[in-house]
Design a protein with these regions (language model features):
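Conserved CoA-thioester-binding segment of acyl-CoA-metabolizing enzymes
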Residues: 1-71, 108
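Short, active-site-adjacent cap segments at secondary-structure transitions
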Residues: 75-79, 125-127, 233
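Well-ordered beta-strand positions
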Residues: 138, 178, 182-184, 190, ...
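C-terminal long alpha-helix characteristic of the crotonase
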Residues: 38, 140-145, 197-244, 257, ...
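CoA-thioester-processing core
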Residues: 106, 110, 120, 126-179, ...
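Glycine- (often His-adjacent) and acidic-residue-rich active-site loop
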Residues: 12, 64, 72-108, 153-156
Length: 277
């Protein structure tokens, strides 16, 4: 195994206590992004979302970067959604609309970064984490990977239209509707079978080594050709979006009694009682 791979593997497995919640690690032409809240299964804070945008902007300015790899620290999760405790402060329509607008900005920035992006997924990849992975160009998984948006049984909120469109184009309407309504998580083999990931490897160490290898391969390809292909695919996806906003869907869910119940139930580790109101 190459030294650069071992270096990355050791950092991802056991980051130092004083490391930031999002680690930006440059190794040659490859920019690594490590979501670093392993005790919280790498659930995203507002700071982590902001740092992800900043790293993407830095990559856009640095022509020596040729590929990005995103993964989660600790080996237990890629990203288990947004940190739910942050939702307790939601009280107004603006809170709900701003949250989804912020999420759209993060995913758009990642989706449009000029270099190819690889999500290296081990463990749960749910909610906001599933959105991040869907915004990447390529995905690899270990055998422990699980993917989905289980909000119909956990929080009672909804996705933005942009995220619904990403899921629709990646999985097709039938499977997208299936995982959204049943709130189930796909395992690694189903992710491979439906094309969500291109490879499944045995464990986290193999996953990180393969991600580095794939990123190095992409780094040898024509940057403008890859950028044009990425942008063309994004524009095709954008044509699926209907006219008009999705604020009615967002407000109906986020301002509901059910959403407040979902947040409190999740944090209390109990089953929510849905009323449809």
């Amino acid at each position: 195994m190459k030294d650069v791979e071992r270096d990355v593997i050791e950092l991802v497995r056991a980051p130092a206590e004083d490391e930031d919640e999002l680690i930006a690690l440059r190794r040659g032409p490859i920019q690594w992004v490590v979501f670093n809240r392993p005790r919280a299964r790498n659930a995203m804070t507002w700071h982590m979302y902001e740092r992800l945008v900043e790293v993407c902007e830095e990559v856009n300015e640095d022509r020596s970067v040729r590929a990005m790899v995103l993964t989660g620290a600790g080996g237990r999760a890629f990203v288990a959604g947004t940190d739910i405790s942050q939702f307790r402060s939601f009280s107004t329509e603006k809170d709900a609309l701003d949250y989804e607008a912020r999420g759209n900005h993060v995913m758009y920035t990642l989706e449009t970064v000029r270099v190819p992006t690889i999500a290296a997924i081990a463990g749960p990849c749910t909610g906001g984490g599933a959105g991040i992975a869907a915004s990447c160009d390529l995905r690899l998984a270990s055998s422990s990977a699980r993917y989905g948006f289980p909000i119909a049984r956990t929080l009672g909120n909804c996705l933005s239209m942009q995220n619904y469109a990403r899921l629709f184009t990646l999985l097709g309407p039938a499977r997208a509707r299936d995982i959204l309504l049943t709130a189930r998580l796909m395992d690694a083999q189903e992710m491979l079978a439906c094309g969500l990931v291109r490879e499944v490897v045995a464990d986290e160490e193999s996953l990180l080594a393969r991600a580095q290898e794939l990123a190095e391969e992409l780094a040898t390809h024509a940057p403008l050709t890859m950028w044009a292909s990425k942008e063309a695919m994004r524009r095709i996806k954008e044509r699926l979006l209907p006219e008009g906003a999705d604020s009615d869907l967002i407000l109906a869910c986020y301002m509901s009694r059910d959403f407040k119940e979902g947040v409190e139930a999740f944090l209390a580790k109990r089953k929510p009682e849905w009323r449809g109101e």
